[in-house]
Design a protein with these regions (language model features):
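Glycine-rich nucleophile elbow surrounding the catalytic serine of serine-hydrolase chemistry
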Residues: 150-161
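Short, surface-exposed "cap/lid" segments of acyl-processing enzymes
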Residues: 35-117, 136-139
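Alpha/beta-hydrolase fold nucleophile elbow
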Residues: 140-152
């Protein structure tokens, strides 16, 4: 009820990357939204304050910095736009200096306005998209310590990632 009558939470801005599943057993795509600096462009097909990376932005995306990176997993039918999730991310990414974090949200298949491209959806044992994202993050940001947080079903997925990785 609280999220239905209040505003949409902290005004976080996201850039979206679409990933194609590497494992053919789980064919299809999913998306990851990365918290970014505010921008003015809009995309009516995505949640508010979310756009896709441009080719030029994506070319410059990797980094060798040591800033901590939080990987968040939303609850059932949620996404990066959820108020509860934004209230966790905002103080971390909004801090200054050495206290500032980077963050991304792994949106489960069919969530956060991402088109379903597979007959494989998600459940608590659906670790493949999160594991692929972590592998990709380690390559793009080799010096960043990675941390994870999950909410509801996302917490179950994260627990299984930790158990089976």
């Amino acid at each position: 009820m609280w999220t239905a009558v209040k505003n949409d939470g902290p005004p976080l801005h996201y850039k979206r990357k679409i990933f194609e599943a590497e494992n053919p057993a789980y064919a299809g795509s999913y998306c990851v939204d990365f918290v970014t600096q505010p921008f003015s462009e809009t995309d009516e097909t995505l949640p508010v304050r979310t756009t896709y990376f441009s080719d030029a932005e994506y070319e410059k995306f990797g980094s060798s910095d040591t800033r901590p990176m939080l990987v968040a997993l939303h609850g059932l039918s949620g996404g990066s736009y959820e108020v509860y999730l934004k209230h966790v991310l905002a103080p971390l990414v909004g801090a200054s200096g050495e206290l500032q974090w980077e963050a991304c949200v792994v949106n489960s298949r069919g969530c956060a306005f991402h088109k379903i491209t597979s007959s494989v959806l998600f459940n608590a044992r659906s670790t493949w998209d999160c594991r692929q994202t972590v592998k990709w993050l380690r390559k793009m940001f080799p010096n960043r310590p990675l941390f994870g947080i999950g909410f509801s079903l996302g917490a179950n997925i994260l627990t299984n990632v930790c158990l089976y990785t």
